[in-house]
């Protein structure tokens, strides 16, 4: 990884590792808590917080998570493989993602491009020691907000 990138970065919504070349996939190996999980051939991989589950991850067919839930959501972007589902894991489990193919990728955090990743570069995602606190106006609950934003009706 680029040496100018700080060793620790924080994301409110997501970290995304995406292909750089149009028309090609990127190959990414994923470890969960030090154990190999799988390798993805995909346009990218989204590692989202519950807050970020309603952003890019949702548009990639990932689930919507309650913001009260503590979890990390792994959502592949246009995967070229049989296992094409999102995975919800405990935030205490470290997730490592390594670029294993010869095609490079871009690391973005909360929509901001951070650096280019090449074969052998790894990104580690784990829980922050800081908890985000949000200001709420009114007495609206998460499920009420979802209903309003997506036009969901009572039946």
Per-segment meaning from a language model:
Residues 1-46, 54-155:
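Catalytic phosphate-donor-binding core of small-molecule kinases
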């Amino acid at each position: 990884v680029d040496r100018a990138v700080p060793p620790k970065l924080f994301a409110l919504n997501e970290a995304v590792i995406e292909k750089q070349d149009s028309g090609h996939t990127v190959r990414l190996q994923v470890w969960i808590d030090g154990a190999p999980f799988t390798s993805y051939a995909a346009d990218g991989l989204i590692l989202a917080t519950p807050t970020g589950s309603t952003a890019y991850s949702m548009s990639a067919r990932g689930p919507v998570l309650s913001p009260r839930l503590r979890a990390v959501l792994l959502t592949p972007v246009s995967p070229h493989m049989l296992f094409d589902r999102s995975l919800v894991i405990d935030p205490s489990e470290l997730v490592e993602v390594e670029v294993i193919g010869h095609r490079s990728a871009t690391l973005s955090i909360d929509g901001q491009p951070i650096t280019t990743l090449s074969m052998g570069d790894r990104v580690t995602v784990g829980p922050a020691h800081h908890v985000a606190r949000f200001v709420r106006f009114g007495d609206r609950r998460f499920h009420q907000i979802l209903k309003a934003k997506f036009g969901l009706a009572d039946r």
